[in-house]
Amino acid sequence: GITSYYDDLFLARSRTIAPEAYLRLLAQSITRVQQTKGRLKQSLAESSFTAWNKFYKQDENSPNAIVSYYQKGALAALCLDLVVRNKSSGRHTLDSVMQQHYRDWLDTRQGIPEKQWQARCQAFTGLDLEDFFQTTLYTTADLPLAELLATIGIGLQWQAQPRGHGGAFLPEPPTETPAPASDFGARFKQNSDHATLTHVFNGGSAENAALCPQDKIIAIDGYACTDLTAQWAQLPIGATARLHYFRTGILYVADITVQAAEADTAVLYITDRELFENWLYNDRA
């Protein structure tokens, strides 16, 4: 996760991409994690430990059961950097911690046991980070992103956008929260005359209508399912639609209620550009 965090950050620090482009990438990363139901069931430590038999062998239910230790790990690294900066009044950063780890490796040429990373981080910075590491690594609690991003001049607003929105950066702080969009609650592959479900998300419209992966939706309210995204978007929240679909070659009919999207799309904006760029282009490390 730490290396994933630096992937995009180094592009911004080297001015290969603009600060606004970096924030757009960050908003997309935050959104991907927030829209993963598995984040509520699997901790970062569990995700790492079971990577070879779960993360790298994903199935139709994986979005409901696991979280990416790359994606959430990158956000955890961002949070760690901001916690270290705040607690040390700017004397230490994640950069300086990583450099100290590298110097230690040069002396010993040995790797770091699991608990030693935290111990060395605390010893080097002189900070008590036990609560942060315990909560971040070993529980399924959401990361305090809004609170920490505010310390570097970045605002975070959660919006109930369609799942395909993906997160965004706004040049100006939003003056209002958009009305919630509708959400079908599933991923699907659209074909010319039907949509085949690939993943059904916990708690969404599709799951509540007892739909399953591999179901082939052929009609919505009597009309051929030629564009499920567009047809679903035309239905008002709270309405009931009738679906015709095939499952294992058998035709079924189900009524589905149009649910509002969850407020899980991240929109970032700059509240203090000087503060943000001082963090982004930090040259002390």
Per-segment meaning from a language model:
Residues G1-L11:
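An active-site-proximal "capping" alpha-helix that borders the catalytic cofactor pocket
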